[in-house]
UniProtKB/Swiss-Prot annotation:
UniProt-listed NCBIfam families: frr
GO molecular function: ribosomal large subunit binding
GO CC annotation, single: cytoplasm
Originating species: Desulfotalea psychrophila (strain LSv54 / DSM 12343)
GO biological process, alphabetically ordered: translational termination
Lineage: Bacteria, Pseudomonadati, Thermodesulfobacteriota, Desulfobulbia, Desulfobulbales
Family per similarity comment: Belongs to the RRF family.
Pfam families to which the protein is assigned, alphabetical: RRF
Job description of the protein: Responsible for the release of ribosomes from messenger RNA at the termination of protein biosynthesis. May increase the efficiency of translation by recycling ribosomes from one round of translation to another.
Location in or out of the cell: Cytoplasm
Keywords in alphabetical order: Cytoplasm, Protein biosynthesis
Protein name according to UniProt: Ribosome-recycling factor
Length: 184
């Protein structure tokens, strides 16, 4: 297989991994620490990720517990969670901040499915752009007489097959996440 196709395949695999990573931040009805990945807290004069100022655990299926290393960090942590837009209300007992994950409403679940579909489409476009870049490179190689016309058509076909494989992976991951979001 051509170096160009191998590189294209690697870039597509990275896109699928990035897609999975993005989807892990989409909230479902279950507690997941990854929904807090993007939250930053103002601590000691600088901005720090939430997981660097507290220990995050899941004591129950619908609860996340945050235990700050410094109890003075509880108010900034609560403030950061409220500002995050996740719709979570922190409850603190002076030592631990608890986040109860509420049951998602039907409307909220439908909105989240739309969000998943939108993210999936963005990554499909990214994968197709990678294919286009690879085909452009192959056409340049043909123009420079590095490959023959027959090789060009065969490699374009290989590029399309690889693209189809990664788009299918993306669709499977997307369908799985949509199903997870719609579970009551």
């Amino acid at each position: 297989m051509s170096e160009v196709i191998v590189e294209m395949s690697g870039r597509m695999a990275k896109s699928v991994e990035a897609f999975k990573n993005d989807l892990s931040r989409v909230r479902t009805g279950r507690a997941s620490i990854s929904i807090l990945d993007d939250i930053t807290v103002v601590a000691y004069g600088s901005t720090m990720p939430l997981n660097q100022v507290a220990t995050l655990t899941i004591p129950e299926s619908r609860m996340i517990a945050l235990q700050p290393w410094d109890p003075q960090m509880i108010p900034p942590i609560e403030k950061a969670i409220l500002k995050s837009g996740l719709g979570l209300n922190p409850v603190n007992d002076g030592k631990v901040v608890r986040l109860n994950i509420p049951q998602l409403t039907e409307d909220r679940r439908k909105d989240l499915v739309k969000q998943v579909k939108k993210i999936a489409e963005e990554f499909r476009v990214a994968i197709r752009n990678v294919r286009r870049d690879a085909i452009d490179t192959l056409k340049l190689q043909k123009k420079d007489k590095e490959i023959s016309e027959d090789d060009l058509f065969k490699l374009q076909d290989d590029a399309q097959k690889e693209t189809d494989i990664y788009i299918k992976q993306l669709d499977e991951v997307s369908a799985s996440k949509e199903k997870e979001v719609m579970e009551v």
